[in-house]
Amino acid sequence: MEIKILKSERNYLELEIEGEDHTLGNLIAGTLRKISGVSFASYYQPHPLTDKIIVKILTDGSIAPKDALLKAIETVRVMASHYIDEIKGLSK
């Protein structure tokens, strides 16, 4: 995975993530939309044959786009950890 910043402003961040597809795009964008202060979050895959997504984040100014992204990633990490613990508990 390689991440490039395409555009960075006070309330807007646009990233290109190489080596990822709809799986990560949907997860990140959906989680971002639930964060207070995020006005808009989306992603798209420029071409169906490429392993690359573009993520766009717009905030209302109460949170920086990078901070919102970090919060979303931490939320996903905690959620995944919870699922791992739940699945491990099933085998007991």
From Swiss-Prot:
Major location category of this protein: cytoplasm
MF terms in GO: DNA binding; DNA-directed RNA polymerase activity; protein dimerization activity
Signal peptide interval: none
Organism: Saccharolobus islandicus (strain L.S.2.15 / Lassen #1)
Subunit and partners: Part of the RNA polymerase complex.
Function per UniProt: DNA-dependent RNA polymerase (RNAP) catalyzes the transcription of DNA into RNA using the four ribonucleoside triphosphates as substrates.
Keyword Nucleotidyltransferase belongs to the record: yes
This protein's name: DNA-directed RNA polymerase subunit Rpo11
Catalyzed chemical reaction(s): RNA(n) + a ribonucleoside 5'-triphosphate = RNA(n+1) + diphosphate
SUPFAM superfamilies: RBP11-like subunits of RNA polymerase
Alphabetic keyword roster: Cytoplasm, DNA-directed RNA polymerase, Nucleotidyltransferase, Transcription, Transferase
